[in-house]
UniProtKB/Swiss-Prot annotation:
Keyword field contains Transferase: yes
One GO location term (cellular component): cytoplasm
Keyword match Transferase: yes
Protein name (Swiss-Prot/TrEMBL): Porphobilinogen deaminase
Function: Tetrapolymerization of the monopyrrole PBG into the hydroxymethylbilane pre-uroporphyrinogen in several discrete steps.
Names of required cofactors: dipyrromethane
Quaternary structure, from the entry: Monomer.
Record's keyword terms, sorted: Chlorophyll biosynthesis, Porphyrin biosynthesis, Transferase
Further comment found in the protein's record: The porphobilinogen subunits are added to the dipyrromethane group.
Amino acid sequence: MKKQLIIGTRSSPLALWQAEYTKAELSRHFPDLDITLKLVKTTGDVLLDSPLSKIGDMGLFTKDIEKFLIAKEIDLAVHSLKDVPTATPEGLIISAFTEREDTRDVIISKNGVKMLDLPKNAKVATSSLRRMSQLKSLRPDFDIKDIRGNLNTRFQKFDEGEFDAMMLAYAGVYRLNFSDRISEILPHEIMLPAVGQGALGIETRVDDEQTREIVKVMNHSNTEYCCKAERSLLRHLQGGCQIPIGSYASFKNGTLHLLAFVGSVDGTKGIRNEITKTGLTSPAQAEAAGIELAEELLKQGAEEILSEIRKTC
């Protein structure tokens, strides 16, 4: 068994929370392990002047950390799973999916105003095409503004009065103790989350069997089923672009329920569908369900929507 582990992580407050959480959990199970953190500045942390959708790189927040992992300068990488591309680099693997936090999105607004009660032409901040598409389908009048930076920076920009509201993932808001700022938690019926939202993905080298065995204690089986279904769906649809796709899976007693959304950026077109599969006994079956639902969405017209988006990316 290894005596030392080096965890690679971004240096943002949320990324550090995630890495420290992982360190604490591993230390609880393996108290003799010497665990340290290596902070890595990623492309996504540096390129803050452009919207994520315009940069177009699928590994903005992960690939720079993965370089250290491939070079054996770190033993594992801790990511927000929603930031991890569905195809990992050769030689790397997601070895653990941590138990998921609440997957929903939240609205932060002035005076606690709920989303549908925001004034006409309200300025709503988000960096996500997925959120933009679903927001515009509900409120075409919204003036969507791009916002970048870590969570603390976003709250600072909001407090300076640049926006009427902003949309964030509940998980990050909760983990960094901003829950008292939440104006509304949006149900999945109107806002499907990003694939993998709320979970952490712990990435290792495929051939590092000792580390893979160690991080298995962090794996949450239900989360693995759900996230593999969602990631399989996204992989089948994506084609290398930042596109407005939302998905949420639940899994209990062998039954998987998977919801998905594909929409145009301006919110004028949107397709939702769902699938339920019973008797599942392996994550591979959950992945197959993701592909099946992706095919249904394509038949419903998702291909037309995605083709239009790919012309601009």
